[in-house]
Amino acid sequence: MDTTPLHCLLADPSFAACYDHASLNAADSQRLAATPQLAQRQDWQVSRALKQQTDLPAVSLSHSQGFAALLCAPQPLTAGVDIEFIRPRDFKALSALVCTQEEQDFLKTANCPSETFYQLWCFKEALIKAANLDFPSDMKSVGYVFDSGQPVGLRAGKQTDWYGTSAILADTMALACVWKGKAVTLQWQFFGSLKPNDLTDRQTI
C-alpha cells in the first residue's frame, strides 16, 4: 500500500534570525498588514521562517515560547499539530476539565506527570484542529482510546480512524502530530539549533 509523506518541520527560537518579511505568502502579508505588531513577535518570526523552508502546502501550524511546528504534505491530508511549553500546572484540576475519566485514571499512573499530561493535551489540541472542532469545549470528546487502561488509539468524537505521534522536544516542549487514515509516513525536519536527538520520548498510536 502506498503511503503519503507528512512532513513535520520543527524550529527553535534561534530560527527567528531567518525570518524574511519579503518572502511572506499573500495570506500572511495581509494578516501582517492588518496587525503590524506581529512582526516583532518571536513566535511569528520563527513560524513564518519555517513556512518559507518548503514549497509544500501547509496543513497545520503551531507555536509556543519561540518554538514552532509545521505540518505539510504533497497532497491533501486531514492532519493537525500542536506544540506546548511544559510548565508546572495543577494537572489534577485541569485534567478534570478536559479529560475523560479513563484519561484521568491513566494520568494518575504516570511516572512523568507533566510530560504525560502535555503529550495528551497536544494530542487533544491537534485532533481539534484536524477535525475542525471547538476549543476548549470539545477537549473531552477527543483524545485516547483505551484497552486495559493503556492508550491504543485516538478518537475525535465518534471517529476512531485517527493516528498520531507525540514527543518531547529539547526537554522543554511537548508536541503531537495527528492524521486521519493509516497510510501516512511522518518525516521530521529540524531547523535553528535543533537536532534529531532533541526529539525524545516518541510515542506513536
PLM regions and their residue ranges:
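Core catalytic alpha/beta fold that binds nucleotide/phospho-ligands
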Residues: 1-205
